[in-house]
């Protein structure tokens, strides 16, 4: 069934919001002071992001494709898998969804933001940074991580077995994200998604959070550009080797 564009955009909006609630919500639970999950560990965060992708793909994959990621949308368009006419509306819906999702995380954890004095921990609940402050490493990590994500997701959801059992394919995509966060999350987070980084970073800059420190706009282009580059390569690999 082909849904109207408004319905597809609604799916992208709510899907991206859910991604933020599960993903950055899990970071807030681990990093912010005096939460029930304080210091619960990296696996808790990886699980949050895995579920944060899995559930929207299960819920909205048949409606909009559940891109929930501007890099995925642009990459599919560049490689002829998605109409260019829908790219800008999809990206706007994703950006607004990320904004809403992060705002919900902030409101939910508001008392703990006030109690937390670690500026890096606070920033980490909004956006990515490079653990070693090396921009080249930051770019490469985000590029390769998104390449694997997009290549893996397209293989799961577009090949014959995934089309026959979309629910199973969606679950596997969630595990790909879970695995990527555990394996490639050390250097940068990772972001793997321009909307997941840009809009929360904007909120971090705007919101009156005590002890929040810098929003680090000097490196903010990296988790926007690098995922797009990686996604385009990942989608190209899928088209070259498997799409016929």
Question: What would you call each of these model-derived segments?
Answer:
Residues 1-244:
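Membrane-interface helix-loop junctions and terminal tails of multi-pass membrane proteins
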């Amino acid at each position: 069934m082909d849904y109207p564009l408004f319905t597809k955009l609604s799916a992208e909006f709510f899907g991206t919001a859910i991604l933020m609630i599960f993903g950055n919500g899990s970071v807030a639970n681990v990093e912010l002071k005096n939460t029930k999950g304080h210091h619960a560990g990296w696996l808790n965060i990886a699980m949050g992001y895995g579920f944060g992708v899995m559930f929207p793909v299960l819920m909205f994959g048949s409606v909009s494709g559940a891109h929930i990621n501007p890099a995925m949308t642009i990459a599919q368009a560049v490689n002829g898998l998605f109409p260019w006419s829908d790219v800008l509306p999809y990206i706007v819906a994703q950006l607004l969804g990320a904004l809403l999702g992060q705002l919900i995380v902030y409101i939910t954890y508001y008392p703990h933001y006030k109690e937390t004095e670690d500026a890096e921990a606070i920033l980490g609940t909004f956006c990515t940074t490079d653990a070693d402050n090396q921009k080249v490493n930051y770019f490469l990590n985000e590029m390769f991580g998104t390449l694997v994500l997009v290549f893996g997701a397209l293989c799961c959801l577009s090949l014959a077995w995934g089309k026959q059992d979309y629910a199973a394919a969606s679950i596997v995509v969630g595990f790909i994200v879970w695995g990527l966060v555990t394996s490639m999350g050390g250097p940068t987070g990772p972001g793997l998604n321009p909307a997941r980084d840009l809009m929360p970073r904007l909120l971090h800059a705007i919101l009156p959070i005590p002890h929040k420190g810098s929003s680090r706009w000097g490196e903010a282009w990296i988790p926007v550009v690098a995922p797009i580059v990686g996604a385009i390569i990942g989608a190209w690999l899928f088209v070259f080797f498997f799409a016929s």
